[in-house]
Every structure is written in structure tokens, then in C-alpha cells.
């Protein structure tokens, strides 16, 4: 998702949750 910022934000949030 280079253009979709919302999609990337959600993916990063989900990854952060799995990391923590």
C-alpha cells in the first residue's frame, strides 16, 4: 500500500499489536 495511507496504518497497527 504505497498510496493508501489508511490501509498501511491499519497494517502497522495490527503488526504492532502482534509485536506487543
UniProtKB/Swiss-Prot annotation:
GO biological processes: oxidative phosphorylation
Pathway(s) it belongs to: Energy metabolism; oxidative phosphorylation
Membrane-related topology note: Single-pass membrane protein
Keyword annotations from UniProtKB, A to Z: Membrane, Mitochondrion, Mitochondrion inner membrane, Oxidoreductase, Transmembrane, Transmembrane helix
Subcellular location: Mitochondrion inner membrane
One Gene Ontology MF term: oxidoreductase activity
A Gene Ontology term for the protein's cellular component: mitochondrial inner membrane
Highest taxon, organism lineage: Eukaryota
Keyword Transmembrane: yes
Tissue occurrence: Liver specific isoform.
Function, as annotated: Component of the cytochrome c oxidase, the last enzyme in the mitochondrial electron transport chain which drives oxidative phosphorylation. The respiratory chain contains 3 multisubunit complexes succinate dehydrogenase (complex II, CII), ubiquinol-cytochrome c oxidoreductase (cytochrome b-c1 complex, complex III, CIII) and cytochrome c oxidase (complex IV, CIV), that cooperate to transfer electrons derived from NADH and succinate to molecular oxygen, creating an electrochemical gradient over the inner membrane that drives transmembrane transport and the ATP synthase.
UniProt similarity note: Belongs to the cytochrome c oxidase subunit 6A family.
Subunit structure: Component of the cytochrome c oxidase (complex IV, CIV), a multisubunit enzyme composed of 14 subunits. The complex is composed of a catalytic core of 3 subunits MT-CO1, MT-CO2 and MT-CO3, encoded in the mitochondrial DNA, and 11 supernumerary subunits COX4I, COX5A, COX5B, COX6A, COX6B, COX6C, COX7A, COX7B, COX7C, COX8 and NDUFA4, which are encoded in the nuclear genome.
Name of protein: Cytochrome c oxidase subunit 6A1, mitochondrial
Species of the source: Canis lupus familiaris (Dog)
Gene from which this protein is expressed: COX6A1
Amino acid at each position: 500500500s504505497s498510496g493508501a495511507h489508511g490501509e498501511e496504518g491499519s497494517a502497522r497497527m495490527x503488526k504492532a499489536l502482534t509485536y506487543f
